[in-house]
Amino acid sequence: MTSMSTAATIKLPYQQQQHHLINSNNSYIQQQQQSPQQHHQQSVNINNCNNNTNNNNNNNNNNNNNNNNNNNNNNNNNNNNNNNNINNNNNNNNKQIPQQSIQTHANSILQLNKTMPHVNPPQQNHIMNQQQQQQQQQHYQQQQHPHQQQHPHQQQHPHQQQHPHQQQHPHQQQIQQQQQQQQQQQQQQQQQQQQQQQQQQPQQQQPQTQSTQERKWDEIKIYSDLIKRFALEASHLTISKENYDDLYNMAFCLFKTVDSMDPDKMPMNMGGNSRKNSFDMYNNNNNNNNNNNINNNNNNNNNNNINNNNNNNNNNNNNNNIVYNPYGNDGPTIPSPHLQHQQQHQQQQHQQQHQQQHQQQQQHQQQQQQQQQQQQQQQQQQQQQQQQQQQQQQQQQQQPQYHNGMPHHMQQHSPESMDHQRIVKLPTGNQNNNYSNDYYSIQAVHSPHLGPSMHLQQQQQNQQNQQIQQQHQQIQHQQQYSQLPIEQQQQMMLQQQQQQQQQQQQQQQQQQQQQQLQQQQHHQQQQIQQQQQSIAKQQMPQQQNTPNNGSPSSSDGKSPVNSNTAITSNNNNNNNNNNNNNNNNNNNSTTPVADPQKNFSGEVFFDDIGQDKPQRRRRRTMYSSRRNLKCHYCEVTETPEWRRGPDGDHTLCNACGLHYAKSQKKLAREKELEKQKELEREKERENTRKHSIDFMLMNDTSSAPTNSQNPTPN
């Protein structure tokens, strides 16, 4: 019975009251059976007890209402302190409440309790009430008669007093002592369970958050590495659609995990505190939910009346960030060393992350400084080059050269004439501008982001600088010549003129040579074209004048000259070669041509009908299925080597194929003769038409004077 009662009271304190009522009723029935003479007196006592319990319940409800009001005030003060603590924690990039803020908050609440002694936490109030009840019970038991004891329902409130006429049986004393022992055990078990729950809740929260955050960071690292690999491979490979979809999905997963991360735990590179303000409400809500759960557990374990439960459920919206110690005056609970170790570990991780970020920023700044130094060095080198060029120009000015009234060095391009581009030498090679193994890169002076207006401004500035330099050079040039005597000036002028004449002569010679080369090339091209035209002209009349036998003959019917015979034979050979090449191209479109040395059968067949010479080819694989077919003419089963049409509908043997080819040649020649005859007939018809028209016109002109009224026929 004791174990069952303890289990019931741990879950629901209201069941404890029912259990006590049942025990009291059972004891009352036993008492009736043992002493029926005292029935009337005990019934009176029970009625009085019930009245007292009702009064005490009312008093308890009133006191609980007062306590709830006080708790509301205390909770409001706690909310203000909690909001300040949460803001401080967010600024420190920590989601959990640190130990210092808990201690400061606890001290502030203890000070409030000292100033207002009637205000106590709900758990402490309940414990103090129980202690007062036990003390008063002991005091009353000492004053009472040994046969008179209080009913078990009267132990709930200290203001309950015993009626002087109440008396109980001595057997009931033992039951009451057992019940008191059970209650004490239950209270101790409740306190132990509360301590365990309070220690387990923060321990469960931290590993879950740490594990989820570590998983997310691992996912982010994996996705970022994969995306980097894809990007590197994409620079020298073509991406298929599947790879592109994979890359898109990985990027989407990465951004999704980054969005779900806490910005306070993220490093600065990933946008650490950029979205901090948007997460303040989220952090406050999480803290409030955790505190509400703690308050619910405390209220459900500490209240013994239904009214108290209802009142405390109404107070769930009030937030208490401090977990109270069940022993009352010992102050707030001290977190376990495991939690302290985890907090220290997290703080160390944050410090390491901040140090890494600081180091990265320093490295970035150092790189920028190095780049700036390199740019300055390049600018200094360019300035040195310009100074060297100016010195060379000054040396040349000591031996001036005039061309058309202007000095020669004025014709040279200044180093600033390159408006848009400048040559920047890469680290390898020498500084000289010789065409060696040195590598140069042309860099644009103006950035692509500059508009056309900036581009024009740069051009104008360059032109102004050129004009200023020219003026300075002219002044220096005049000063040098003004210092020299007249004779030396004349000699210098003569030397310059001679040099200029020599240069002009050299240029003229070069131009003449180029013209000669162009003329030679032009003559060669003309000769080649003439030869081609002559060959084409010779081929045309020979094709027209060839008779049926194919022997060359002239239009007069005589044998041609020896010189012409050689030309005609060459032309015929060329025609045959052209036909063979055309046949090769047509055959390659159907089947690939192998080497002539391999799989050569030595058998003869024709591809086209009107060909002069047979062409030796390999046996085709397309005829392998027709080995047992009959010839279309002689109907003899032989290997078919001839075909009639391009589709290969009719197969022929070797003899019939030769006969078929000859017959086809005859047909082709007959068709050509018919065409020629038709052309001659058309010419004759045209001639006859012309004669008839002329004859008609002559008749019209002769009959014109007679028929003066109708000169034209109707």
Curated annotation (Swiss-Prot):
Residues 667-693 have a biased composition (Basic and acidic residues). This is GATA zinc finger domain-containing protein 10. It comes from the Eukaryota. A zinc finger (GATA-type) spans 631-656. Residues 28-97, 115-180, 266-362, 394-419, 454-476, 528-621, 667-714 are annotated as: Disordered. The keyword Coiled coil applies. The keyword Magnesium does not apply. Keywords: Coiled coil, Metal-binding, Zinc, Zinc-finger. Residues 148-168 have a biased composition (Basic residues). Signal peptide: none annotated. It comes from Dictyostelium discoideum. InterPro entries: Znf_GATA (IPR000679), Znf_NHR/GATA (IPR013088). One of its GO terms (biological process) is regulation of transcription by RNA polymerase II. PANTHER family: B BOX-TYPE DOMAIN-CONTAINING PROTEIN-RELATED (PTHR16148:SF23), NF-KAPPA-B-REPRESSING FACTOR-RELATED (PTHR16148). Residues 30-94, 130-147, 169-180, 283-322, 340-362, 457-476, 528-549, 570-588 have a biased composition (Low complexity). Residues 271-282, 550-569, 699-714 have a biased composition (Polar residues). GO terms for molecular function: transcription cis-regulatory region binding; zinc ion binding. GO terms for cellular component: nucleus. Residues 661-694 form a coiled coil.
